[in-house]
Amino acid sequence: HQFIPFTQSAGGQNTGAVLVNGDIGGDLVINGSWSVSGYHSIGRPSSVTNLDADDLQQGGSAVAIHASVGGGVTIEGMGVEDDVDDDGDGITESAGDTNDDLSATILTYGSAPTIAIETDGVNNIVIGTTSSGYGLHVQGTLAASGVYDNVDATAIRIAGSGASTVSIADGITLDRLVSAGASNGSAYGVVIGPNASTSVLLQRGVLAANVTSDNAEEAVSVLINAGGNMPTLTNSGTIRSQLFGEIGAATGIRDQSGTLTTINNTGAIIALLIPTDADPADSIPAPPATGPAVAIDVSANTTGVTINQTADVVFNDEDTVDDDVNARPTIQIYGDILLGSGADTINLLKGDIIGDVSFGAGADSLTINNAARFAGGITDSDGALTINV
């Protein structure tokens, strides 16, 4: 059992906070406040003309894992809701556990992922199961910020290299806040890279990617690269990708691997392009933002994808009181949906889908029931679409 509770700020080129280069037989548990940057300043100035290369050095990841962890990885925190024993130490708040709600806050400023689970190109990485039942369980806050122009930001990246692989047992669960933001660069929330695999992404908190740019950049909350593998995504929280500016792309979920076959949504999946006005004091309106706003892009899939949007269920955790009910988002998919050449199915049984749906080829099906609403266009390349209302 490796428990890391510290408060730490690290600075300098390639500097990190937690580095795992050797196998851990038990679990890795991280709490406290962590901040990593290679920059001279993490405050974005109005002008960078006085900054030289030493002021803009790139730091490393706050948490870099390059070896196996038998008992999984937990970023501690309150999680989805305030329970009687959030830290799982057997002592409840009513019994005097003053640290029960202590949540990790892990921040990176620069291009390095906040959490990187990546191989060295030689050895495989296996992340086992935590006591909560997941391989990677984020109950606290993770944030990545590029800060300066042309610096991409990534909150979580899991990837193999060469012939070596990364396997996350029993999925990834996000229970609080994971975010990435960039200026004139791209932002990525969770990236499942080549040679990386996990069974499910269970998103119960807020997962966000935000970009401010007048260049052709992108904000993507969930990205599965070609060569990655993740068959299921279940969202009961909010997945939000936003691009502020004139041109670019906002994508909630993009699968380039063709392995994502089931998406369950009882929360919100949102992709937005938001025009910005450089001079709000004048009478000239901001130019419209142009580019794709895609909630779900599984167009690389050839075997068929099922998207289920259904009613919310009471959060099943340690207590009998559903304390987070007031924080639940309105059930919706806002943005376009791009499907592939397989037999795809959309079951819209609660809430709204607002956006155009491209079914592609295959024997596809769209079912709308229970007063759910669809607003948008529908295209199907081969005419083999069945609609049930």
Regions found by a protein language model. Name each.
Residues 1-354, 358-375, 379-389:
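Surface-exposed loop/turn motifs in large extracellular/passenger domains
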